Regions:
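Structural signal for hydrophobic
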Residues: 95, 137-138, 159
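Helix-turn-helix DNA-binding helix
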Residues: 121-122
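Major-groove DNA-recognition helix of helix-turn-helix-type DNA-binding domains
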Residues: 127-135
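Short amphipathic alpha-helical/adjacent loop interface patches that line ligand
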Residues: 57, 61, 130, 153
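…primarily DNA-binding HTH/wHTH and HhH modules…
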Residues: 144-175
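Short Lys/Arg-enriched helix C-cap and helix-to-coil transition segments
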Residues: 134-142
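Basic nucleic-acid-binding alpha-helical/helix-turn surface characteristic of O6-alkylguanine DNA
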Residues: 1-117, 165-175
Length: 175
């Protein structure tokens, strides 16, 4: 008789329509592995069957929708950190503590808190954040302005408005 290790379940992926556009969520049995912002979400295949990964992806979808509707300030999700190295993970976890809902932190301050000397290195890590929104890289700003954002500055501005960090923009077109 041969013992065969059980096959790991395939990751589950879903795409959900939200107030900011389509968002993709990838989950494994370990937790949420990736969140894809609008423009990126269309590239992920929708997969998964009943099981822990599918349940995790569904829970993430509910929480992301609630957040984007202004009905949730924190996420209660298990995260799969397998796509990031230890330093990157430490920076992202520090970000979650340093910048809760409605609070920003500068690239330089996040660097000081994590021992990363160059704020540009923090910027690179934010651009490679596999879990945007859940790990709030949109709350990291430049010392003299918004800084960049993988989802674009318009989306960053909208998220900061949602959290009350920036005032809503006036609609001067009357639409």
């Amino acid at each position: 008789m041969t013992n065969v290790a059980p096959r790991a379940r395939s990751p589950a992926s879903i795409v959900l329509e939200t107030t900011i556009g389509a968002i993709g969520v990838e989950a494994t049995d370990e937790g949420v592995r990736r969140v894809h912002l609008p423009g990126d979400a269309a590239r992920i295949p929708v997969t998964g069957d009943a099981g822990p990964a599918s349940d995790t992806a569904d829970a993430a979808a509910v929480q992301l929708r609630d957040y984007l509707r202004g009905e949730r300030e924190t996420f209660d999700l298990t995260l799969d950190w397998s796509d990031v190295d230890q330093l990157h993970r430490r920076v992202l976890e520090t970000l979650c503590d340093a910048a809760p809902f409605g609070v920003t932190v500068t690239y330089g301050e996040l660097g000081r808190r994590t021992g990363v000397d160059d704020p540009r290195d923090i910027g690179v890590m934010m651009s490679r954040n596999p879990l945007p929104l859940v790990v709030p890289c949109h709350r990291v700003v430049a010392a003299d302005g918004l800084g960049g954002y993988g989802g674009g500055l318009d989306l960053k501005r909208r998220l900061l408005e949602l959290e009350g960090i920036l005032p809503p923009r006036l609609d001067l077109d009357g639409a």
